Curated annotation (Swiss-Prot):
Transmembrane segments: none annotated. Disulfide bonds: none annotated. One of its GO terms (cellular component) is cytosolic small ribosomal subunit. GO terms for biological process: translation. Keywords: Ribonucleoprotein, Ribosomal protein, RNA-binding, rRNA-binding. Belongs to the universal ribosomal protein uS3 family. The gene is rpsC. This is Small ribosomal subunit protein uS3. It comes from Geobacillus sp. (strain WCH70).
């Protein structure tokens, strides 16, 4: 059986960048665990704020965190109170100076993480898995996606035997490295156990820009 590599990991260094950007020698393991703690804390604290991606950069004793969210108002809070409280909590957690940037996601229906989380929440609210997937596909295509594929796995509809069902529309060229494909997973906790949700969204091609050389401007 052909297995599918993670489309995001496959494109790192080509059209995607790392979510953590820092270099360390001795303290690598400690900083990696710190990154995991930061991500876990932010996702838990902002679980209703539609957070898609958390980027972490480090320089000396400073941590720069960029939070990509579809609900920036909820993250920032009234007069910046929420983001300031989050910054203080992360400073206490890491023991370093923390700076937080908030980036708004303009089209949440084209973000695989948010689409997967949305399908998972609907499944927890006992919405039919077929209906949840088809609605997500329609919204993504209306938002301008070139293609989308969704898959839900587990005891669908409370069946005794677990299975997977997937739906797709448009094209999702997983082998084309210049194709901007967003991929994410989510879990739904239902009365029959966990259901796994996977989403692939093709947002069009990204052509790598050629760097001009100083000689002749080629």
């Amino acid at each position: 059986m052909g297995q599918k590599v993670n489309p995001v990991g496959l494109r790192i260094g080509i059209i995607r960048d790392w979510d953590s950007r820092w270099y360390a020698e001795k303290d690598y393991a400690d900083l990696l665990h710190e990154d995991l703690k930061i991500r876990e804390y932010i996702n838990k604290r902002l679980q209703d704020a539609a957070v898609s991606r958390i980027e972490i950069e480090r320089a000396a004793n400073r941590v720069n965190i960029t939070i990509h969210t579809a609900k920036p108002g909820m993250v920032i809070g009234k007069g910046g109170s929420e983001v300031e409280a989050l910054r203080k909590a992360l400073t206490q957690l890491t023991g370093k100076r923390v700076h937080i940037n908030i980036v708004e996601i303009k089209k949440p229906d084209l973000d695989a993480k948010l689409v997967a989380e949305n399908i998972a929440r609907q499944l927890e609210n006992r919405v039919s898995f077929r209906r949840a997937q088809k609605q997500a596909i329609q919204r993504a295509m209306r938002a301008g996606a070139k293609g989308i594929k969704t898959m839900v796995s587990g005891r669908l509809g409370g069946a005794d035997i677990a299975r997977s069902e997937h739906y797709s529309e448009g094209t999702v060229p997983l082998h084309t490295l210049r194709a901007d494909i967003d991929y994410a997973t989510a879990e739904a906790d239902t009365t029959y156990g966990k259901l796994g949700v996977k989403v692939w969204i093709y947002r069009g091609e990204v052509l790598p820009t050629k760097k001009k050389t100083e000689e002749g401007g080629k």
